[in-house]
């Protein structure tokens, strides 16, 4: 889910002690924790003076070791996944295979002499960050704003929140990583337009199109590759060094490759003993990887409808590679680049908050930029490793400082709804609706003497339940037996500020109610979300036609049921010829419904209404017309 910021009216000043809250970027490769005071952000270092803490969890006996680059890696990839999904995804299975018991039936890992869930293991990273912050700040810290990928659904979000809660944090808010980066650049203040957030981390690549209008943030498209990152650049360089200089494929060679990559960000050549590599060679090696990211960014823009881009925000340490800016300049006709770091930026010595505008010649590339006929800025004056945690820290201060007059809310990434009779989806909360939100809708029964209503909660953009993702099912029981359509059940969909959905149903006559908190037992990654949206766009016409057909069939079935019941109750008012006419007309409707021909169904219903009006006696005509009024499909099984 994405973030929206709403500024509330000015309030009277009053004294209030500020609560300490931190921002946390729980990354796939590295994690950071920071605190903001008076809009100035400080990234908190570990005992060994590191700001970037490797997101690795190891153990000796029952003691956990965080950040030693050993043990379990990339645990973030596992959030919201089922054991089945992991077993069927080689890249995920490789992460846990050394910790998973053979023939295990649930997702628990043998870790520190215990059987632990993913959230329990991930909690150790949060505990480590919390301890470092408390040690540095010399105070207890219990509140945090935590960033998550824009594509994380409520299952993955819930697992992040659980891990943080186990660690002793009260999660003030989960915010989308691209929004945090934009907030770090101050784009929430009097900025309008669309920004492309290019996030190349160690293990993943994410790109988002962020629309900002008067302080309101909305992620309108996301794309990426969960298996592409700066680590892949290191691997390519390592392979080159091994082949060119006959080096072993070892950790030492990998470290040498990283050093070469970092040096070549500000020098034309790298030399070490008998090893040498120049900038041109490096760029030739990694160009295919960079081009992959550019193509993914183009696809994301197309998904968003090719809006005019006002700026590109760079996130992730791998974006320091000069070739990335060069290729972005070609693809997006960059006007100028804002830069903050000196040549020694890899040594952790930022050159202060000085923006040096470097005007660069626009390089045309018809293959990638023919749809981009305008100039944009590349924003890179904040350390790309820290941009996300900066935004989180600023949001944490915003939510706890006594002078704050802002409120952060999210938006729903995929529509939420309920299955109606006939398998049709009634969308209750639409995609990109700001939250928290509560929506009430009324539903009724379809059959006589129905004492229960089953509710099937769905997620997705398709028109039919079979094409959407099932979230949960529940039944409202104990309803009084009444004729179809007489029961009225109020159904409330409510999403809180952290994106957790609860659904409640209430029937007034029997005073019966039921509430369920929807926590899906599996998550959706960005690829699945993209596929769901793409399928919705691709099948929109077919889905609409299918829905219209199903609605016509339901209307036909409802009419047939009502008229046949009326005939049984009003036999004394009807002559044999009238009954024969009605049955003949109903047979036509039945045949049309059986043939699944929408036009034929609609024409048969029109013919029925027309002939009934002409041939029936006045009293019966009134009764039947009453039966035909007010029919709708808001009926559940």
UniProtKB/Swiss-Prot annotation:
Protein's name in the database: Chaperone protein HscA homolog
Region Insert, residue ranges: 335-376
Disulfide bonding pattern of the chain: none
Keywords (A to Z) from UniProt: ATP-binding, Nucleotide-binding, Stress response
SUPFAM superfamilies per UniProt: Actin-like ATPase domain (SSF53067), Heat shock protein 70kD (HSP70), C-terminal subdomain (SSF100934), Heat shock protein 70kD (HSP70), peptide-binding domain (SSF100920)
Origin organism lineage: Bacteria, Pseudomonadati, Pseudomonadota, Alphaproteobacteria, Rickettsiales
Organism: Rickettsia felis (strain ATCC VR-1525 / URRWXCal2) (Rickettsia azadi)
Gene3D superfamilies the UniProt entry points to: 1.20.1270.10, 3.30.420.40, Actin, Chain A, domain 4, Substrate Binding Domain Of DNAk, Chain A, domain 1
NCBIfam families, per the entry: PRK01433.1 (NF002399), RPE3 (TIGR03775)
Pfam families given in the database record: HSP70
PROSITE patterns documented for this protein: HSP70_2
Molecular-function GO terms, alphabetical: ATP binding; ATP-dependent protein folding chaperone
Function: Chaperone involved in the maturation of iron-sulfur cluster-containing proteins. Has a low intrinsic ATPase activity which is markedly stimulated by HscB.
Family statement drawn from the similarity comment of this UniProt entry: Belongs to the heat shock protein 70 family.
């Amino acid at each position: 889910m994405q973030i929206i910021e709403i500024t509330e009216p000015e309030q009277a000043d009053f004294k209030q002690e500020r609560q300490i809250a931190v921002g946390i970027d729980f990354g796939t490769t590295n994690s950071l924790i920071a605190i903001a005071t008076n809009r100035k952000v400080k990234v908190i270092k570990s005992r060994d003076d590191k700001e970037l803490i490797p997101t690795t969890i190891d153990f000796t006996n029952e003691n956990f070791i965080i950040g030693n680059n050993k043990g379990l890696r990339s645990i973030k990839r596992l959030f919201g996944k089922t054991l089945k999904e992991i077993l069927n995804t080689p890249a995920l299975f490789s992460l846990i295979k050394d910790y998973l018991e053979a023939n295990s039936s649930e997702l628990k890992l043998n870790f520190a002499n215990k059987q632990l869930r993913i959230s329990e293991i991930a909690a150790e990273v949060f505990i480590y960050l919390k301890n470092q912050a408390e040690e540095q700040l010399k105070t207890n810290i219990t509140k945090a704003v935590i960033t998550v990928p824009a594509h994380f659904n409520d299952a993955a979000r819930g697992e992040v929140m659980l891990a943080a809660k186990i660690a002793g944090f009260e999660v003030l808010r989960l915010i989308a990583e691209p929004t945090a980066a934009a907030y770090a650049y101050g784009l929430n203040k009097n900025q309008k337009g669309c920004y492309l957030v290019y996030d190349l981390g160690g293990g993943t690549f994410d790109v988002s199109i962020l629309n900002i209008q008067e302080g309101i943030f909305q992620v309108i498209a996301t794309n990426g590759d969960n298996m592409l990152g700066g680590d892949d650049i290191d691997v390519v360089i390592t392979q080159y060094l091994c082949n060119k200089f006959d080096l072993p494929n070892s950790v030492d060679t990998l470290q040498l490759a990283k050093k070469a990559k970092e040096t070549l960000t500000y020098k034309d050549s790298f030399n070490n003993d008998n090893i040498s590599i120049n900038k041109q060679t490096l760029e030739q090696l990694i160009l295919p990887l960079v081009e992959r990211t550019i193509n993914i960014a183009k696809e994301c823009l197309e998904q968003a409808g090719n809006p005019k881009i006002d700026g590109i925000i760079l996130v992730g340490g791998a974006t320091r590679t000069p070739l990335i800016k060069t290729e972005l300049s070609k693809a997006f006709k960059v006007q100028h680049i804002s830069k903050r770091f000196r040549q020694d930026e890899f040594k952790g010595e930022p050159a202060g908050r000085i923006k040096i505008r470097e005007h660069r010649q626009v390089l045309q590339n018809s293959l990638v930029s023919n749809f981009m006929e305008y100039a944009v800025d590349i924003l890179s004056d904040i350390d790309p490793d820290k941009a996300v945690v900066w935004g989180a820290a600023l949001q944490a201060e915003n939510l706890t400082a006594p002078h704050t007059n802002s409120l952060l809310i999210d938006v729903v990434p995929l529509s939420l709804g309920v299955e109606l009779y006939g398998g049709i989806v009634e969308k209750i909360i639409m995609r990109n609706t700001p939250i928290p939100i509560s929506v009430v809708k009324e539903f009724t029964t379809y059959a006589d003497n129905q004492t229960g209503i089953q509710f099937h909660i769905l997620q997705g953009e398709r028109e039919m339940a079979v094409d959407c993702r099932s979230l949960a099912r529940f039944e409202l029981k104990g309803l009084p037996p009444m004729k179809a359509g007489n029961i009225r059940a109020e159904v409330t969909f409510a999403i809180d500020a952290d994106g957790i959905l609860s659904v409640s149903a209430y029937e007034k006559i029997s005073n019966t109610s039921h509430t369920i908190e929807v926590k899906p037992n599996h998550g959706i990654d960005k690829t699945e979300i993209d596929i769901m949206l793409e399928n919705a766009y691709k099948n929109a016409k077919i889905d609409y036609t299918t829905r219209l057909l199903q609605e016509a069939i339901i209307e036909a079935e409802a009419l047939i049921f009502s008229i046949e019941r009326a005939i049984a109750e009003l036999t004394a008012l009807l002559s044999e010829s009238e009954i024969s006419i009605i049955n003949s007309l109903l047979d036509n409707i039945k045949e049309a419904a059986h043939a699944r021909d929408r036009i034929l169904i609609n024409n048969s219903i029109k013919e029925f209404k027309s002939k009934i009006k002409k041939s029936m006696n006045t009293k019966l005509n009134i009764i039947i017309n009453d039966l035909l009024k007010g029919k709708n499909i808001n009926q559940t099984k």
